[in-house]
Amino acid sequence: MNIIEIKQLNRYFGEGENRVHVLKDISLSIERGDFVAIMGQSGSGKSTLMNIIGCLDTATGGSSKIDGKETIELTNDQLSDLRSQKFGFIFQRYNLLSSLTAAENVALPAIYAGMPQSQRLERAKQLLEKLGLGDKWQNKPNQLSGGQQQRVSIARALMNGGEIILADEPTGALDSHSGENVMEILRQLHEEGHTIIMVTHDKHIAASANRIIEIKDGEIISDTQKRQVKSAVKNPSVFKGRFGFSKDQLMEAFRMSVSAIVAHKMRSLLTMLGIIIGITSVVSVVALGNGSQQKILENIRGIGTNTMTIFNGNGFGDRRSRHIQNLKISDANTLSKQSYIQSVTPNTSSSGILVVGNKSFTSANLYGIGEQYFDVEGLKLKQGRLLTEDDVDQSNQVVVLDESAKKAIFANENPLGKTVIFNKRPFRVIGVVSDQQLGGFPGNSLNLYSPYSTVLNKITGGSRIGSITVKISDDVNSTVAEKSLTELLKSLHGKKDFFIMNSDTIKQTIENTTGTMKLLISSIAFISLIVGGIGVMNIMLVSVTERTKEIGVRMAIGARQINILQQFLIEAVLICLIGGVAGILLSVLIGVLFNSFITDFSMDFSTASIVTAVLFSTLIGVLFGYMPAKKAAELNPITALAQE
């Protein structure tokens, strides 16, 4: 029964005037279990014929059938499956992968055939034992002689059963003794039922075959049958696996990717550098933005949450506002009666000289406030008492200090009951409160708080106030409250001669602004990620070029295009992923150092930014690794195997 049937087979190379007719109307059939030698000089077309038989190449025209299946119209993946199921290749130069042990080289075809991992190594060891290399299964190719390497190559050809063994000049790189050993193995495989097709130019080697086909200039010039094929041929054991994607194939691709990265440590590190810098920049910028945003929002909360301050004029940029003094104490009293307002305080202030004993302070601020001011602004009592309604009604000359003023004036002394003189007016200290955060950071002035009635009557004179601060009830929407408050004051004044600063609006504005800045700076930092991705693509293209022969070997033993694609894609993703993790760790280290030396605010790392960084580095690997991986997967097996 014929296992191979070829009819009117032609193969051309090149186009136009450079077109070469390599095989010319070749017709032949090979019986199952036969031992055939194809002879011819270099350039005769014998290797091209063997490549077409072995599904490494396709004919330009004609028919080539393996076990009755036409191969001319098969897809690349179908040809890969056929090579994995039917063929075992023995190459003149062995074509073993230098990074793998003898057993791993032998087991390689079984990965693409889908053989379970538990069986692969055991079968590889058995084959090596059969070929006299049982004690060499852990050796790398460079630790083996030429004859031993060729025996490993033969074992690899038998891994999936090797029903058809294709041997291309199997003794060409060996001495006579090793060559004779290889031929003895081939004769034994023939006895076991394997169909052997051997390409050689040596008549002595060809004499071992049952049949000798001689080719010259792409044509068969002789076909000599020396011995008949035995009528009862034992079929060799062939592994019937699943010829598709599997977990083992993925793990093999992952392992080979790691090996490739480790084999070129410095190159891999330099390739990762762009990714490391990009990820470090993005994560650090986001952490800085988060930290500064949290600090500013914390300071706003220190000024007072859900509060609004009403000022004279049309805005902070209104030059006429200093001359407009339309806010009155009666406005504050009216506002205090509204159901949506929790607390109200009129505000006025004066700057002057503070004298305490024999010490004088020139940067002192005296704030005239209502008794509800501390509730509105969220200031906590630290010592003594706060202002009361009686203090306001009676214009008592009492003051409450903030902590900074207390430390500057009295140091470690108890300030309660002590007298301070502001602009030649004596005031008795009754309490100490927490510092108020103004403008986002504490100021350098000494802050004293006194009843607004006292400041108006005894310091500034007049009845007009600078501002009114209200605290909105927690269950009221601040935007709705602001509209109601605006309409009320407009009705009281007859016009809108004031403006309102809403702490919630400021908070939202700051969040939006810092978010925009983070996005802008992150976008700039993202450019370095793109540059790093281009570097990864360049290195992967170099890697494909360096490992072209390896790709050809994998394809010859049954690897599909998807297997090659995933191997190089995983390598690119690994480089970017490792670079991304390194970038995150470097950013965290920078954050630790930053937080150790900077006390105003800290770098705040978020889980979202770290996860996003990891995903982005992976995405960069996929995007920039795809083109080199696709190039590797689309290589022609013959071209790849011919690469030195």
From Swiss-Prot:
Cytoplasmic membrane side: 1-268, 545-573, 629-644
Subcellular location: Cell inner membrane
EC number: 7.6.2.-
Topology within the bilayer: Multi-pass membrane protein
Enzyme class: translocase
GO biological process: response to antibiotic
GO cellular component, one term: plasma membrane
Annotated TM spans: 269-289, 524-544, 574-594, 608-628
Function: Part of the tripartite efflux system MacAB-TdeA. MacB is a non-canonical ABC transporter that contains transmembrane domains (TMD), which form a pore in the inner membrane, and an ATP-binding domain (NBD), which is responsible for energy generation. Confers resistance against macrolides.
UniProt-recorded name of the protein: Macrolide export ATP-binding/permease protein MacB
Species annotation: Aggregatibacter actinomycetemcomitans
Gene this chain is encoded by: macB
